[in-house]
């Protein structure tokens, strides 16, 4: 677990410092990697479309220790992002006990946005199973956030 967290932190730091912003950000729990090669078959058509049209995309894979599905080598391990968001939610809830979950996620997004030098801002965010959708939709208020599994569009 600690090695995955450190690896994830290094990937996220490298992305925040060295990469240009993505046009499309994909975020999903690891247990959706159900293909034989460890890729997420639900995002395969979206990745193909992004590559076909020259859009820069990034995939962040949420940790899931309860699954035997392998990690996708094309995605950034999302352990550091996941634990940072979880810790910030708990701290903000402690200081603002009457805040709604939307208010908390908005505050979390502002902090994460500043810590990543606005590099996680994308024009489109696509998630599966509503994972981090509120946080991602608040990273870039001008972007669009979609939940692929439930067909929900935010922003």
Feature names for model-found ranges:
Residues 1-155:
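Catalytic-core helical/loop segments in enzymes performing group transfer/polymerization on anionic/lipid-linked
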């Amino acid at each position: 677990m600690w090695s995955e967290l450190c690896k994830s932190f290094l990937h996220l730091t490298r992305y925040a410092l060295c990469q240009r912003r993505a046009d499309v950000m994909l975020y999903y729990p690891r247990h959706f990697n159900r293909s034989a090669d460890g890729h997420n078959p639900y995002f395969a058509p979206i990745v193909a479309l992004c590559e076909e049209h020259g859009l820069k995309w990034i995939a962040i894979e949420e940790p899931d220790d309860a699954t035997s599905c392998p990690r996708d080598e094309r995605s950034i391990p999302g352990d550091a992002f996941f634990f940072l968001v979880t810790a910030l939610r708990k701290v903000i809830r402690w200081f603002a006990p009457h805040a709604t979950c939307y208010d908390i996620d908005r505050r979390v997004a502002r902090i994460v946005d500043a810590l990543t030098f606005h590099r996680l801002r994308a024009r489109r965010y696509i998630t599966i199973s509503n994972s981090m959708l509120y946080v991602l939709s608040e990273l870039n208020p001008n972007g669009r956030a979609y939940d692929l599994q439930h067909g929900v569009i935010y922003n």
